[in-house]
Every structure is written in C-alpha cells, then in structure tokens.
Amino acid sequence: MTARALSELVDQGWAQALEPVREQVAQMGEFLRAELAAGHRYLPAGANVLRAFSFPFDQVRVLIVGQDPYPTPGHAVGLSFSVDPEVRPLPRSLANIFTEYTADLGYPQPSNGDLSPWAQRGVLLLNRVLTVRPGTPASHRGKGWEAVTECAIRALVARDTPMVAVLWGRDAATLKPMLTGSACVAIESPHPSPLSASRGFFGSRPFSRANELLTQMGAEPIDWRLP
C-alpha cells in the first residue's frame, strides 16, 4: 500500500467517512512497509488493501463482514469472501455461500468466485482486518485495522439510511452493538466455514432476508445475481 493521500486511494465519500482515522490508515501503511522490509509479504496486493472502500459510500445498503483476508496466496482480492474469477477450487467458505445462494434465491451456481458485482450494486464486502501474512490466518489482527473498519461501520450507521448488516459467525456478531441506528438492521447466523455451516448457516436465507428488510425500510433491494 503506497503512502498516498486517502482521497487518492478510496471513493470520495469514504475519504470523508474515514477522515477520523486518516492517521491510523497512514500508520497501517507504515506497518505494511515495515513488514516488507523485514522480509514478510502481505495479502492482498497493496493496490487492493483498501478496495472495499473504492465503491460509493452513499450507495451501501448491505454490509457483509468477514474476519481477515484469505491467507492462501492468489485468493485475497480486498473484498471479503471474494476471489478472482480464475481461482479454482473455490475457498470452502465461498463454496458454502454459493450453496446457500442457490438454495435461497433459486439462481444457478455462479460460474466463478468473483463477488465484485455485489460490491458494484451496494454490498460492502468488508473484512474487519484488511491484511494478513501469507499462510498465517489472523496474523494482522490487533495491529490497528480494527479501528479503521469500525470507523467505517459507524459512518455507515450514522448516515441514517436503510442498511442491512449480515453477520456470519461469532467474530462478526461482536459488531452488533455498533449497528443500532434506526435505519440499520442486523441478521445473524453461523459462519459459512465448513466447521459451522451445517449448524445454521445453511437454511438461513441471508440474501432474501436482506432484501425483505430493505424493502420494508423503503430501500431498493439488492440484485444478487452473479454470472
């Protein structure tokens, strides 16, 4: 991640929303450069670290929270749960998300694991921690990203416009106290990982439930269809 002004790296709405943590973002850039200097790589690629904030702040209607990026080289792309179109096989959590997507919405299995169409339609795919060392899950937790992503979530809630937060798993559920705005609703289920998907993620209907809630609040539902 380069040492550029925040306004050059993210959507202008997000640049304003993240102004309270602008210095923290700069410090995280310094942390990543120190990692590289010490011989440690990080994922995703620098240009994608803040990718979730490249889509319009004012258009976010659904928030899907991840923990930290995929630690497998070639998988992390800066959007929670998403991978590049050519990645095969899919990460198992994403495969389970697609199983539920098909069961919930009746759409065919997507042709690849690229979730960027969702991001373009108002879904913020946000990891709580935005980087990770390759092969070492959770290695960048507690380093400072949480302050940035929690600021982002508070800014979304403060807009007071309809938003549904989809919280998968215990880690995401800890954010629920922040999601208390009059126009914000949270839906929870177990995580889609193979360890917990059968304990209540399958059958949770997150996509149709999110759209039902958006419609009830007078907002446009999400077009969840993927190619």
From Swiss-Prot:
Q: Which UniProt keywords apply?
A: Cytoplasm, DNA damage, DNA repair, Hydrolase
Q: Where in the cell is it found?
A: Cytoplasm
- Tell me which domain of life the UniProt entry assigns to the organism this sequence originates from: Bacteria
Q: What class of enzyme is it?
A: hydrolase
Q: Does the keyword Transcription regulation apply?
A: no
Which chain positions lie within coiled-coil regions? none
Question: Matching SUPFAM superfamilies, A to Z?
Answer: Uracil-DNA glycosylase-like (SSF52141)
What does the protein in this record do? Excises uracil residues from the DNA which can arise as a result of misincorporation of dUMP residues by DNA polymerase or due to deamination of cytosine.
Q: Which NCBIfam families match?
A: PRK05254.1-1 (NF003588), PRK05254.1-5 (NF003592), ung (TIGR00628)
Q: What is this protein called?
A: Uracil-DNA glycosylase
Which gene is transcribed and translated to give this protein? ung
